[in-house]
A protein has these predicted regions:
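A short LG(V/I)-centered, amphipathic sequence patch enriched
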Residues: 40-59
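Hydrophobic hinge/microswitch elements
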Residues: 129-132, 136-142, 148, 202-260
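Short beta-strand-centered segments that line the small-molecule binding cleft or hinge
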Residues: 85, 109-113, 130-174, 182, ...
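N-terminal short secondary-structure element
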Residues: 1-35, 64
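Hydrophobic/proline-rich hinge and linker segments of small-molecule sensing/allosteric domains
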Residues: 160-201, 270-280, 294
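Secondary-structure junction motif
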Residues: 105, 148, 185-186, 194-218, ...
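A late-sequence structural motif
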Residues: 259-298
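N-terminal winged-helix
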Residues: 29-30, 80, 86-118, 122-135, ...
Length: 298
């Protein structure tokens, strides 16, 4: 269906006068009449009743008028969305984040501000570990990631990174633990014989590897009595007395009753959250998101 013919049809249908419709469209009347005849042939129905005194819509013309308005409006909307997408104002942004990232107040604030500024950009949020994010970025399955790389992890060169926030790892102990009331930072080696509640080994590079490296520096391999994929679950199991754990300090705000946090004395306890994307990323909405996040990260 020719969009120009529909535009001509709508002008005549609204003016009910071929001369005024032609003026409105900045064209002469004969080409306009020809466009209407071609549209009637295409539709297989007469669209206008014509007389010397008046022009009126036939039942078929009245039905087409409503549909034609929708088609023309959709075409205009599609064009506008395409232009917005080309400039980064519309599209889909796939964002991955590790479990602790939503606990940082800045995360929800920056998402809200981006959504308010660019309402036509759809945010597709996914929970992934650090290693899963690297794999997904490389495969083109996500656009941006918020990850927690271990100090020893080297982010691959095709990946661009920017440190956003820093915190440190802390001990999570049952409230009844003998060290729970300690007033000074605890050395991890003091808990070498304790059962641990930790994340299972998944794609590497993140929190699990950092904790194992801490334990190795302290001279032991942790005995994992209970694996738990979610840190909130780990804390609940610690509160139940199933073991001790090492978790980011940001989780202290959701520490359940029965568990306590104690600072670590180990020097390698420091951790960070990094923003990552592909080095060659050219999508405007990704670049705009990156710039906004880095501008409001504090």
């Amino acid at each position: 269906m020719d969009l120009r013919r529909l535009t001509c049809f709508l002008a005549v249908a609204e003016e009910l006068n071929f001369s005024r419709a032609a003026q409105r469209l900045h064209m002469s009347q004969p080409p306009l009449s020809q466009q209407i005849r071609l549209l009637e042939q295409e539709m297989g129905a007469q669209l206008f009743e014509r007389s010397r005194r008046a022009v009126s819509l036939t039942p078929a013309g009245a039905l087409l008028q409503d549909k034609a308005r929708q088609i023309v409006a959709l075409h205009q909307q599609a064009g506008e969305l395409c232009r917005m997408a080309a400039s980064g104002l519309a599209g889909r942004l796939r964002i991955a984040f590790t479990a602790s990232v939503p606990l940082f107040a800045q995360f929800s604030r920056m998402l809200g501000e981006f959504r308010q500024r660019y309402p036509q950009v759809e945010l597709d949020l996914q929970h992934m570990t650090t290693g899963e994010q690297i794999a997904a970025l490389t495969a083109g399955q996500i656009d941006v990631g918020f990850m927690r790389p271990s100090p020893a992890f080297r982010i691959p060169l095709p990946i661009r990174e920017q440190t956003l926030w820093r915190d440190e790892l802390m001990l999570a102990l049952p409230a009844a633990h003998e060290q729970a009331a300690a007033g000074t930072p605890l050395a991890l080696r003091a808990l070498a014989e304790q059962p641990f509640v930790l994340h299972p080994a998944v794609l590497g590079g993140g929190l699990h590897e950092h904790i194992l490296a801490l334990c190795s520096e302290a001279g032991f391999v942790p005995r994992i009595a209970q694996p738990a994929r979610e840190t909130a679950t780990m804390l609940a199991l610690v509160a139940a007395g199933l073991g001790v754990s090492v978790v980011p300090s940001v989780y202290e705000r959701i520490c359940p009753p029965g568990a306590v946090f104690r600072p670590l004395a180990d020097a390698a306890r420091h951790s960070r959250i990094a923003l990552v994307c592909r080095q060659d990323e050219s999508a405007p909405c990704v670049q705009m998101f990156w710039q906004q996040v880095c501008a409001v990260r504090d």
